[in-house]
Amino acid sequence: MAIKTYGLMGVDWEERVNYERLRNERLARIKKLLKESEIGALLCFDMTNVRYITATHIGTWAMDKLARFTLLPQDDEPIMWDFGSAARHHQLYCPWLGERSRAGISTLRGAMLPAAGRAEDVARKIRIELEARGLLNEPVGVDAVELPVLFALQEEGIKVVDGQQLMQQARLIKTQDEITLLNSACMMVDAAYDELYRFMKPGVRENECVGLVSKVLYDLGSEHVEGVNAISGERCSPHPHVFSDRALRPGDPAYFDILHSYNGYRTCYYRTFAVGSASQAMVDAYKRCRYILDIAIDAIKPGVTTADIAKLWPKAEEFGFPNEEAAFALQYGHGVGLSIWEKPIFSRLVSLDHPEVIEEGMVFALETFWPASDGWTAARIEEQLVVTKDGCEVITRFPAEDLLVAGVRYYTASGPLPTTRETQSQLNTRANGYLAEGSKDQEALLQA
């Protein structure tokens, strides 16, 4: 076990996460890639990219606003524009930014009237900094942008190009501290699944499961519970990707995806359970789901490509979908870092013709799905892993090698009720021969 799990607080007697090293290594990585590119400066509005470059964070409420932005010029330090009070806070508490933390705001996704000139103000600020460094005639890579801001940048004579790929490349290989944070985030979900397993029983609703998981994570120190997919019963196939208020019933399948952030670093972590018991169809589906996941994990090592992995997975037509686009993200892999989905992507839709090489230090999740033969149950499993020099290490540790049955164990007069059984009781009595013509059980029942 090479990847260590530490306590979450800072101590003087053990080096855990070194946040100064984390900040410096992230910034050095994107600076190096920027220097090697044809881009003169990077302009980022996506909060995860802003955090990667500047190590600033003002809460998840701002994630969809595209209002905060940072400029990273060639051979220079990043400049950060933020909400006024946040900018002042950064000056006081983020010494690595100092006076390069400035007040500035975009249009709040169009909430401010165009006549207010906020888009033009953003563009003017960027032009001034580029001119001061002799970069105005160089391309500026932008990761995501509001259209009014894009048009205003172009009006200022700035050539805007795609900056997403450069940022994705920077975030592709994780530093040692990023890996520690990702491992810590997974540790929290291990604990959440343990509580969830004890909690599930008939009558518990999907939304209650979401509430329990969220509380466990926040109590452990989660920064943000991005989502908990809680899917049960006949909702399992096809996968709806959202929880409801449906109550669990005896014999239900139930699968969950827990997505949260610890100091910015995410989890994507599926587990499947049966409530009380599982049908044979469900057991078989789980075994198939686990098998196609395991053959992928076993193949992971540096030098292998995403195409090599995607080829191991069944085609869409083999599990009920007309094509790979229709089945996208069911047999799937994706990088995990400051975002849930980063490079590299593993999918038969794109990877077979456009493979990416797996490298040491990548962190990604592999997830598989298999619908049961009964037409309504299904299994979903996901493991998050770190690529090592000669293979990989899985950092999602809640047991998943076999289908777990949650809830109380039921007992009959003749002993424990089997955990593999059909949800309809009469199907189990028939299977046991109770109703067979001329059987001893039938004769005894008739005489009674």
Question: Where are the language model's segments positioned?
Answer:
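Active-site neighborhoods and metal-handling regions in enzymes and metal-associated proteins
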Residues: 1-448
